[in-house]
Amino acid sequence: MTTARHLLVVDDEPHIGLVLRPYLEQLGYRVSFARTLDEARSAMRAVPPADALLLDLHLPDGSGLDFLRDLRKQGGTARLPVLVLTAEGEDRILREARRLGAALVTKPFSPTKLSQRIAMMFGDIKEGEPE
């Protein structure tokens, strides 16, 4: 029996969780949520930590981009798959997220697009492959 991959969704918008949890669980993922960076940091100290992050860039207690930079500096999370969920349109910020190794999905997004990006992030499908 394989263990479900654990996704930590870091987003302060409650409706994101209401929409994503049932959809992602139906796809076989275990899902937990953090609404602040402080909650996300605590969740990342859990044993075992999440297998991947879905990360908003704008959170009430700071920048998701700064959090991503911090993750990349730590040995245990330097290669953690991260998918940035954002309505951000500023190219400089999006380029920095990509430079830090994050995949991007812009809000609003379709569930199909999200599931494809997650599968690509884990290497289950290649870009351009059907799901």
Regions found by a protein language model. Give the residues of each.
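Non-catalytic signal-transmission and effector/linker regions of two-component phosphorelay proteins
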Residues: M1-L8, T112-E131
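The feature encodes the CheY-like receiver
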Residues: G17, P60
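Charged docking surfaces used in two-component/phosphorelay signaling
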Residues: L18-Q26
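Acidic, metal-coordinating helix/loop segments flanking the phosphotransfer/catalytic sites
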Residues: F33-A52
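Acidic catalytic/metal-coordinating carboxylates
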Residues: R35-T36, S63-D66
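Active-site residues of response regulator receiver
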Residues: D56-L57, T86
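Short amphipathic alpha-helix used as the core "switch/output" element in two-component signaling
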Residues: L65-A78
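Alpha4 helix (beta4-alpha4-beta5 surface) of REC/receiver domains from two-component response regulators
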Residues: D66, E88-T106, Q116
